[in-house]
Design a protein with these regions (language model features):
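Activation-segment/catalytic-loop signature of the eukaryotic protein kinase fold
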Residues: 82
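Activation segment signature within eukaryotic-like protein kinase domains
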Residues: 123-124
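Amphipathic regulatory helices of Ca2+-sensor modules
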Residues: 310, 341-355, 379-390, 415-427, ...
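Conserved N-lobe beta3->alphaC-helix segment of eukaryotic protein kinase catalytic domains
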Residues: 49-71
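Conserved N-lobe ATP-binding subsite of Hanks-type protein kinase domains
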Residues: 32
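Conserved short submotifs of the Hanks-type protein kinase catalytic core
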Residues: 87-100, 104
Length: 463
């Protein structure tokens, strides 16, 4: 059973054999962040370097890595692989060249420039969609703030990426109560300060971010921590800032609905369905979106190795490369939970242009062929994989990078064991089928697949 997370490698060795550190982007108490380049392919990433002895919250770091392995959403940062040596831990991640949302907000405030409601709504919607995905999957972030939101590029319409899951909590049910005040005080809900809360603490934090976007100021401010806690717990805020004279009643009403006690507070899903979000940040027009069902049918006929290569490429697509697919995915994802059901796909056909007539039986078959992790849902990477024009999108360097991901011991050959590590057969029948597939790629019959056999095998079978 293949999953996107199968491609996120864990390496107990020095990183400098594989990555070159281009320049430092920032640093903190834990270590440094670098812009880095993969030596074999030239691809550029961000590298988070931790000094192991300085890691104070090892449990939190493990939680973050585990969650990044599991999550698959266009507005959540991607983790590609990890390296660990005697003194350091390295996380290779998606590069976001636009910096922190906090920096953008601070620059706007300095230049006396605020976001329009449409711009604020566009960005808030992305944050809300990422948080909604987490909540649907039983995760509470617990530290939502502009410093933990990155912009994928310097472009004004850049996609946002949620980061830093070190304080996140995986819940057994969404009725679970959490204890212990964690997070950043300015964005902290009253119930978190009081020490007993649920996932709606994230809703409050989103309200604080929205308030700052629209006004340039935090809703709760005091000269010392105790007074700030008091103001938050008493929910003392106002719309007196000059900027609010130009803010719509719908926006103010939404903020009022958020800054209430937890039981009365709306869910993230409720906010996504609010008048203000829907009117100011509608989905991309279905008139401009096109689902190429012929391409999906072609993809459905590929074998598991081919699909894994295409999924690897889809997983490594930059946000700008994937923008059209993101728009289609979000249009079809009716409840914004970050995955697609068969019913959402059916309804999506009505909204998007498509160039292929398809009956329900064929649609169900295509759905099952797209669902390569067999969980009954189509996740984001699976969706992009099926829609992308892989013959144009997959270059030699992508095939090399995918081969190296299969080649866990870096021997220059893929063994059958390494083959199974990625493709994960669930029983003896699947293992036998994989062995037959492996032998088809092993052109010279020496019991291993080298780089040329891998590339030629992929190209031959795709063509």
């Amino acid at each position: 059973m293949f999953k996107k997370s199968n491609f996120i490698g864990t390496h107990q060795e020095k990183i400098d054999k594989y990555y070159y550190m281009i320049k430092e982007l920032g640093h903190g108490s834990y270590g440094h962040v670098y812009r880095c380049q993969r030596i074999s392919t030239g691809e550029v990433f961000a590298c988070k370097k931790f000094v192991k002895k300085l890691i104070k919250n090892k449990k939190g770091l493990k939680t973050e890595i585990d969650l990044l392995r599991a999550t698959d959403h266009p507005n959540i940062i991607k983790l590609y692989e990890t390296f660990e040596d005697k003194h350091h831990l390295y996380l290779i991640m998606e590069e976001c060249s636009g910096g922190e949302l906090f920096q953008r907000l601070a620059l706007n405030a300095k230049n006396n420039k605020l976001y329009t409601e449409k711009d604020a709504a566009r960005m808030m919607k992305q944050i809300l969609e990422a948080v909604n995905y987490l909540h649907y999957h039983g995760v509470c972030h617990r530290d939502l703030k502009p410093e933990n939101i990155l912009l994928s590029s310097m472009d004004e319409c850049s996609q946002l990426k949620l980061i830093d899951f070190g304080l996140s909590k995986v819940l057994k049910t969404m009725d679970d109560i959490m204890n212990g005040a964690v997070g950043t005080l300015y964005y902290m809900a009253p119930e978190v300060i009081l020490g007993s809360y649920n996932e709606k603490c994230d809703v409050w934090s989103c309200g604080v971010i929205l308030y700052i976007m629209l006004s340039g100021n935090p809703p709760f401010y005091a000269k010392n921590e105790d007074k700030l806690k008091q103001k938050i717990c008493e929910m003392k805020y106002n719309f007196d800032a000059p900027a609010f004279s130009k803010v719509s009643q719908d926006a103010k009403d939404l903020i009022r609905q958020i800054f209430v006690d937890s039981e009365s507070r709306p869910t993230i899903s409720d906010i996504l369905n609010s008048t203000w979000v829907k009117e100011n940040a509608p989905n991309a027009s279905s008139e401009t979106l096109n689902i190429d069902w012929g391409r999906i049918m072609k993809y459905s006929k590929l074998n598991l190795v081919q699909k894994s290569v295409i999924n690897f490429r889809a997983f490594h697509m930059t946000t700008s490369e994937a923008q059209e697919f993101i728009d289609i995915f979000k249009l079809i994802d009716e409840n914004s939970d970050g995955v697609l059901t068969i019913d959402e796909i059916k309804n999506g056909i009505k909204h998007c242009k498509f160039n292929f007539k398809i009956n329900e039986d064929n649609l169900i078959k295509l759905f099952n062929d797209m669902d390569i992790d067999k969980n009954g849902l189509i996740n984001y990477t699976e969706f992009v994989s099926a829609l992308m024009d892989y013959e144009k999108s997959i270059k030699q360097e992508h095939l090399i990078a995918c081969f190296q991901n299969y080649d866990e011991d870096h021997s220059g050959k893929i063994s059958f064991k390494e083959f199974c590590r990625i493709l994960r057969p669930q029983n003896e029948i699947e293992r036998k089928e994989l062995k037959e597939l492996y032998d088809r790629f092993d052109d010279n019959g020496d019991g291993e697949i080298d780089i040329n056999e891998f590339i030629q095998g992929f190209k031959k079978t795709v063509n």
